[in-house]
Amino acid sequence: MSVSFHTQMARQEHLYKLTEEGLIVGGAILFLQGNVLNIGRIFVAPEHFRKGYGSFMMQEIESMFIGVKEITLDTPDWNIRTNTFYIKLGYTEIKRDRGLVYYSKRKLTENMIRLT
């Protein structure tokens, strides 16, 4: 994605960044539509892969948008690493289309009780 695209997303308040010691190590592009949050993209700089930043960002996103009922996202079907990552985080595959795998995670509301 181009610099101009990221600039536009930042101006529209969709772009979130993760920094460490003043350097951007990752970020996310988020779209809130009613009570559904779509994670348009989440990214970590390659030199920071496998350091827990992706998991940290996903946890923070879920905490920031605690009132949403569902979080959706997609990733390429060929990317085994990201598909495994989202499943590990509790996302459920809802469909495959045009080389993408679509995932959803429905969140419990305060009026719902999880039975264990």
Language-model segment annotations:
Residues M1-R41, A45-E47, M58, M64, ...:
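Acetyl-CoA-dependent GNAT
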Residues H48-F49, T72, F85:
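Acidic/histidine-enriched, beta-strand-rich ligand/metal-binding domains
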Residues G34, H48, N79, T109-N111:
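Residues that cap or initiate secondary-structure elements
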Residues I39, T72-T75:
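Conserved hydrophobic beta-strand within the GNAT/NAT acetyltransferase core sheet
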Residues G52:
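Glycine-rich phosphate-binding loop
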Residues S55-F56, S63, D77-R96:
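Conserved active-site alpha-helix within GNAT-family acetyltransferase domains
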Residues D74, T92, G99-T116:
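Terminal substrate-recognition subdomain of acyl/acetyltransferases
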